[in-house]
Structures are given as C-alpha cells and as structure tokens.
C-alpha cells in the first residue's frame, strides 16, 4: 500500500534511492540492499490505483529508470483495475501518455518505448469491449507524419510499432494476465481494419521518400524505420477466423510466416503499384546492407501472398507474372551484394513453393523460361560463392544459406512431372550438377580450395573433432544434387564414373610408387601428402554424390531403386553386353578400360564397379602394409555407400516394380552368381575393416551397420550364412579374440545384433543348432564361469573381470535389439536367464555406477523390443524381473549420501533409464501383438498360472520403489523432472481407477508429488499435474465414495487450483488445464467451492471490488447450475471462466 501511505514527493524520493541502488556497480551495494530495492519497485507496481502518483512521477522525476517503472505501473494497473475505471479516465490517461511523449523528444528510448507500450495495452484492452478504438490515434499519427519533421515522424513510427507489437502475437504480447483467446480476438479485430490503416500510412511515407533524390542521414534513418515497419506488417501472422485457443499458440509458433491476409486486403495488396514500390525502394537502397535486408524481406513476404485475397486463378497468374517481371528487372545485369543473397533466394523459394504449379505454368512461357534460367544462373553462382565461404572459413555463411534455399526450390520443381514434361529441366539440372561437382573437386578439374583470385588456400586444413560429418552436414544439399543427377542421368552417371575411375587409377599409381620407394630404400621415403589428400577429398565428394544419386535414405520403409535410374538402365539395356558388365563388376582389381568391350556395360553397374575399385585399392594397400597412408574418411565413405546401395539394389525384389532392368536382375537379383559374389565381397570388406580399423570408432560403426544391412532381410541373410568367413567371424567374436575385442562397446553391441539376425536365416535344424552353439552359448558359458567363481565378490573389481561383464551386458543389449516377431520366442527365453543373474550383479556392482547403468539399460532394451510380443505369462516373468531389479536398486540407493555432483549426475542417469523402463512396460497396454503366447508354442513347458496383473500395476509399484529416491535436488534436472511427471500424468489419465487402490504410503507420495509439481515446478510440469487432476476427480465422482483418501485429496486440490486461478499471477497458457481441473473439482465439492467464494468475498474491504467480484462469481456459477460432468456444461463454464479471468483475473493480485 506504498502509494497510499506516503505522499507523492516521498514516493519519488524512495523510488529514486532504490533506482540508485539498482544502478550502482556490484562492488558498491550488497545483495540484501539490491533485493530491498527490487522489493520497493515490485511493491510500487502492485499498489492500488497508482495513476495520480505515476503522473506526478512522470512530470517531476529526472531519473529514467523511475520513469520506466512508473509507465510499467500504469500499464499493469490499467489492466488489473479495468472494470473499476470510468471510460473517461481511461481515455484521459491515454491522451496524457501520448502528449507526454510528444512534448519530450529527448526521452531515453527505453522509457519512450515503455510509455508507448502502455498506450498500446490500453488500446488493446479497450478494443474488446469497444470502449476505445484506434481511429483517433491514427488521425494523430497521420498529422505527425505529414509534419515533415523527422523527429516527429520517428515518434509516429514508434507509436505504430508499439501497436503492432502488442497486437501481433498472443504469445509475445505483454504479460498482462489475459487469456490466449482474449489476445486472439483482439488480434482478429485489429488485423481487419487497423493493420491495413498502418500499412497505408507506411506506404505513403515510403512513396514520399522513394521520390526524393538525396536523403540526409536523419531522413535515411526515418526511411529505415518505416521500411522495418512495412516488413513487420507484411510478416503479420494472420489469424484465421475460428481458431480455438489450443491452435492459436501452435499457429503462432510457426517460424516462417507466409502472407495470407483476409479478403478485406484485396484492394490494397493486389494494387500493382504497391509491389512496384517495394522493387523501387530496394533498387534505391540495395547498397545499404541493413535496409536491403528489410526491403528484401518485404519482397519475400509479397512473394508468399496466398489465400482468400485472390478472387480466382487468373488474378494469381497476373500477380505472379507481374512479380517475376519486377524481380528479373531488379536482379538481371547487376552484381549481387553479399547482403542480398539470402533475401533473393527467399523470394525465389517462396514463389516456387507457395504458388500452385498450374499458376506457375500459366504465366507467359518466355517469362517462365527466363525465370528458370535466372534460377539456374543464381544457383551456380551462389554455389561457387558458398564454396569460397568454406575456404575462407567465414562465420556468416550467407551464400551457403542462399544456396541451400535454391537447391530446395529445384527439388520442388523437378519432382513434379504432372506440370512439366520429362526432360523439361534436364539442361538446367546438368548445369547445376556440373557446378556442384566442380566446386568440390581440386584443380585442375575443379575449384575446391581456390580463393577468389584462383590461388590455392592454406595448405593444412584443420578438421575439428566436433565437426559434423559432411554426409550429415550437407545431407539436404546432397539430396537435391542427387535428384538433379537423376533427372540428367544420361550426363551425370557417365560423368561420375569417368571422374571416379580416373582418380582411383591415380590413387593406385601414387600408392604403388610409394611402395616401390619403400622397397628400394626402407625408411627414407617421402610422400607427397598434398597430392594424396586432394585425391582422397575428391573421392570423398564423388562417393557422397554417387550415393545420393543412386539411392534414397529411407527410414523404416522398403527402399526402392529410383524410377529415373531404373528407366535409364532399361532404356540402354539393348546396347549392353551382360557378360562384359558382369566381368567388370566382378573384377574390382582391374582397370575397367582394360576389359575388352568395356564400353558396352550397363552405366549404373559400371559406376558401382568404380566404387568397388576404390574399395579394392584400399584393401590392397592394407595388404601391402600401407595403412598409414590411407584415409579413414575414405574407408567410412566406402562402407556408407555400400550399405546404402545394398539396402536398395542387392537381391532386388522384382515384385515391387512394374518393370525391371535386365542387367540389374542378372547382376544382383535373387539366385544369381552376381549377388552371391557381391555378398561374399562385402562380407570380406566388413571383416577386413573390423581388423584393421578397430580403433577408428566411426569407421567401425559404419562397417557393422553394413553388416546389419546384409542380414536384416532374410533373403540376404540366407546367402550370408553360406559364406565360410561369416562363421569364422561369429566364432572369433564369441571367443572375444583380438582384434574384435578391441572394438568400442556400441560397435560390439551392433555386431552382436547382426550375428543374431544372421542366425534366423534359412538353415536346417542341425546347422541352426550348431550356429547358436557357436554364437550364443560361449556368451552364456563365459558369463556363468565368471559369476559362479567362489571368489567372484573379491575379484569383481579386477579390470579383466569388469571388461568381461561389460562386454556381456553390451552383447545382451545387441541381442535384444535384434528382436523380431519371428525370433522373439528364442531370444526372450535366452535373455530371461541372464536377467535373473543381472539382478545379482546389481548387488555386486552397487558401487560401480557405469555397470549399474548398463544393467538397467539391458532391461530397458528387452522391455522396449520384446514386451509388445509377450503373452500374459511371459509378460509376468518380465514384470517380476523388472520389479526385482527396481527393489534391489532402491534398497541400494535409499538414504545414500550423494557427496559430489558426479554422483548426483550418475543417479540422474539411472533414474532417467528407470523412467524409460517403466514407460516401455506401460506401452504394453496400448501396443500388444501377442496372441496368448502363440509365438511361444513349443518353447513353453506347462501353462501360465491364472494371474492377472496389468502393466499399470507393475508401473505403479515401480513408481512406489523409486519415489523415495526422487529428491528435490534430482528434480532440478529438467529432463528427469519432466519424464517423471509425464509418467505420473500418463498413469492418472489412463488408469485413474488404480490410484484409489494404491497402498497408503504410495498414494500419499503421489499426491505430494502432484502438489509439489503444481506449486514449485516449471509451468510445463504444473500443467501436467493439472491434467492429472481432472481424471482423478472424474474417477472420484464415478465411485461416489465421500470418505475415500482420494476424495479428501481432491478437496485439498480444489483450494490449490482456486487460489492459482483467482489469487496468483499465473501463466495464461495454463488457464485451460487449470479451468478443466477446476470445473471437475467444483462438480465434486460444490459446498466447499461456495465456502471458498464466501471467504474470499468477506475479506474484501473495498465495496466496489466486493460488488464486482460478487457479480463475476455469480455469472461464473450461473453458467452451469448445478455443475455436472456434462461436456456441454463444462464448455459453457470454461467460456465463462475466460471472461471471469479477463475481468477480475488480476484484481486480487494487488498489495
């Protein structure tokens, strides 16, 4: 009650002293003084009706920070006390603030902006009950603009910007405690008329300035402000008419806003003079990089114009044709500035992605042709500049960003064969593809690492450890270039082949020369590293482009040979000699050109052969002890390509295609020598890599991924197991022989997965038995041998014992990852034996966090991969094992003091995994492919006992075990906290009937968790807890037990939610969740609700506030009398609650 207790001069003195403290350097004031000063301002801003005091402060104080706080206090109080204020006093307050700013041109910018924001908030709050409109403000602003005084014009711009910012978004708007729906409604009203008015005022200013020849600095500054304002208007995210509150937030969070105005904007934006003005403005200011960004952004927004503004297709065609003409006139024949690249590419990208294809093709054909030629020229030019940026290692990669956008635009165009005939874009595709290849090859064929003047850049290129792999970093670019390569396959496939063949011949020659030098004089050889490095880099890019051209990266789908590649091979198959093709494919050690008739081979297979030849040169260098000269990156590229290729082409399933190329089906089809040979070759490559490159983790990882590809499809696995070296690999891995035992844990895990998948290939019973004996049995035997030693407890911390245990646990994760519906029976039974032993290991290794973590991970993997296939008795076995694991974990960790941050971090990791385990178990309730243990017939002695325990029971029991471990400190880890509350909410929503049946301690812990989440956690967690309350209250209403613990708990929550909605300032996004919970709780406890309202009203001393509150509550209650769990009534209540919150929401948060 600060303002009421003291006179204005005393208030000013107190605030100015507090401001001095806050502005003082940290060395001059202590924490306590700072907090006291902050408290003074907070208390001042919450004081009741501070308007007179604030006016006095604004007129007399000279301290900027105090002025800023006075403006903020006015803004907050106006909204808070809106229903208590007379219309006249609000109007005079608004006039006072505007006049105040006009009369003080030298105000600090942040103070002026805050005062104008207060004006905008007053206008916004008044727009809804029609008590204030923008007309008078626009009239004032219009006069300010026409004054011709730059300072006054700048102020006019600030007023319009404040209005725009306040109305533009319901999420970025001032936090004035009103609902999303309120902000959405204000925005809709504003965007129809007032926004257009602002745009018209802005356009007038821009027209005036664009006509002037010379602008001084002050004029330029005004021009820039209005251009930025135009950009703000054109980037407005127009709200559609009937969007619910949930969607408003989603709609407004979209990053790239396209221009979709309502019909009422038709006359304004379809006037061709508006578009021409923005092109004129850009031509005038393009050399000023800051202004050019705004003008290009305005044009990019106009290029995205769509929606009801166009009355018909004809108007769209006219607009687009006009725009493209303007664009070509602006950029043809000029040297594009760095600052223009991204803007121009955004304009082109918007034109291509926003305008329907039939509109694009309806513009005059010459104009369209010029547009595509311009796109081709810009793509090649930006590509070259992007390569230069890479060489110069620039921080701001503007050309790279622009190039990416243009390549995406190409992808949109060339994938449309409905509107463009085949071959329409071939010549353009050739140009863009050639330019990409040229930028990525070393001189003399290419321009890689050449600076602008053609000089080679720095010799040694440092590659950071953290740098992303090119194939990931440039995956979008490569996908677009690969697609363009397919469009122009006639040119691109032979080009890649000749470039690769020529480089692999040079690489072979270089390595041979070096070998001869070594033999002639060991130890004295010098290597031309520059030449080798250039070759490796060239081969790297050529393999990446080939991989993206020949195959797609499909996640979870069956990859198909791209139709363009299939058609290209079929078209030329009559010119192809199959035998020569097979000979070239099967002779990676030979130069293609040394094989008679080599020009009559299938071009796609010859391109594959070129890469197999790279692989062969690498293998021969390894055999010749030249590994130190090889590039691990090239090794990675080779196996990455072979994996990608094998997934798509190897043992091609002819049923998936209308027609198939004869060379493909002969070389890689089912039951062919070619496929058997290739599988043998790839397998040998895998084995060689795992021996030679075991220390190169990324390369080893790519290698085992290739192995998984060879066995994940049964048809391929059938051929793999016929190779003798597959069995040798399995034996070698099972016996933990070097060098396989040196592989990193993730690689060993994936290798185990591959070996298990291979075991489900087609074999006779005896062979299959022998295979499992050689792959899985040694794992079991060695594990049991280690843990059953008498002195295992004493030896368990020895390094070799720990390594054995870790390797086994990693292998178990790999086995679980190999689960499929047809192998789950064997794998589950095998893994269950281990799970029981793993629980014993938890005891032994309770003080070895990384082992504990890995044991939990085994359970997580088994549950994740297998639970959905398990019938009741098997699921029970797994539930029991998981609960025993949690019991042991809980017992070992309860009451344990976590001394340092590392220990806390470790427990955080454990608990995160346990949350994942419980969530995986809970998924059984939704995803269940089991057929009463059907998949286990023949593997299951005896019948399941008649037990019926649901996944929910198990998960709740699991929660009970870990709840005591969830300390306040651990809940400070946001990820863990969110996971924990998501799990609890999930259970309450899906199984509310289980909650009342919980043991008393668990029930209390759960209720305490919900209360903690609502009162002390993030708004996201609070929302989750509110969402959990609704189903619990509904469950209570169904059960009609008025003395149950849940009934009593919900009564307590009614008070919490009531206080949150009425007495506390809360995040308005939570109003919906809080409202739904509140309504359900009110239905359940109507008498208590009336009591809460009465208590609140009786505490009000101010009769005006009392009456307003009483009216608001009566209106709220009347919306659903008596409240019942009926959807219609609930919706009516929620709507009234929105209104209630708008009117009295902040009224009681006053000091």
Curated annotation (Swiss-Prot):
Family stated for the protein in its record: Belongs to the exportin family.
GO CC field: cytoplasm; cytosol; nuclear pore; nucleoplasm; nucleus
Keywords, alphabetical: Cytoplasm, Nucleus, Phosphoprotein, Protein transport, Transport
Protein species of origin: Homo sapiens
GO biological process: positive regulation of protein export from nucleus; protein export from nucleus
Protein name (database record): Exportin-4
Residues carrying Phosphoserine: 464, 521
Compartments where found: Cytoplasm; Nucleus
Pfam families in the record: CRM1_C
InterPro entries registered for this protein in UniProt: ARM-like (IPR011989), ARM-type_fold (IPR016024), XPO1_C_dom (IPR014877), XPO4/7-like (IPR044189)
Function: Mediates the nuclear export of proteins (cargos), such as EIF5A, SMAD3 and isoform M2 of PKM (PKM2). In the nucleus binds cooperatively to its cargo and to the GTPase Ran in its active GTP-bound form. Docking of this trimeric complex to the nuclear pore complex (NPC) is mediated through binding to nucleoporins. Upon transit of a nuclear export complex into the cytoplasm, disassembling of the complex and hydrolysis of Ran-GTP to Ran-GDP (induced by RANBP1 and RANGAP1, respectively) cause release of the cargo from the export receptor.
GO MF annotations in UniProt: nuclear export signal receptor activity; small GTPase binding
Complex and partners: Interacts with Ran and cargo proteins in a GTP-dependent manner.
Keyword NAD applies: no
UniProt cross-references to Gene3D superfamilies, sorted A to Z: Leucine-rich Repeat Variant (1.25.10.10)
Organism domain of life: Eukaryota
